[in-house]
Amino acid sequence: MALKNNNNLTGLVKKITRLFPIMLFPLALFTACSESSNDVVEFPDWQNNNLKQWNSIYAQANERIAAGDQTWKVFKTWNIEDTLHSENTSYIVVHVNTNGEGVGSPLYTDSVLVNYKGKLLPSTSYSEGYQFDSSWGSATTTTTAAPMKMLVSSLTDGFATALQHMNIGDDWDVYVPWTLAYGATVHNG
């Protein structure tokens, strides 16, 4: 479709641009007139709560590892040398559900096929945690889910770190601190 009369379009844009501040002003009046707020804070004090939860998961994993439990692992993020001292938020924690039959781990530059679900910590409305991303689609099990092809280097540092330690067929629950996930940015799956 081609625009034949550009003058009409320019005039319309100018009118909308002039009306936009006028349309926003009444909206600001209505929102400012509220005497009480019934807004639900979905993630109250999210950063501090996330850090407390992370510290607990990290400590519990290290206790389990020290007790000889081989289903728990702690890995430093892929981009920090193992010899360097780092805060615990530079690590991911893994609970191994199933060890796969495959050998070898993907490199940072590799593509992988993955079934995954991304969930946040439990919140006001989501007692099991909000699922913000998934490769599962409408499937309910890994048997019926189609894996998603991903380039390891395109993922968050936490996700990329986990993948570089996995073998084909591994089934892990991976715990990632916000610093190695999306940080303070909003992600919409």
Segments (PLM) and residue ranges:
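Cross-family detector of peptidyl-prolyl cis-trans isomerase
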Residues: 2-13, 33-189
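Sec-dependent signal peptide hydrophobic core
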Residues: 17-24
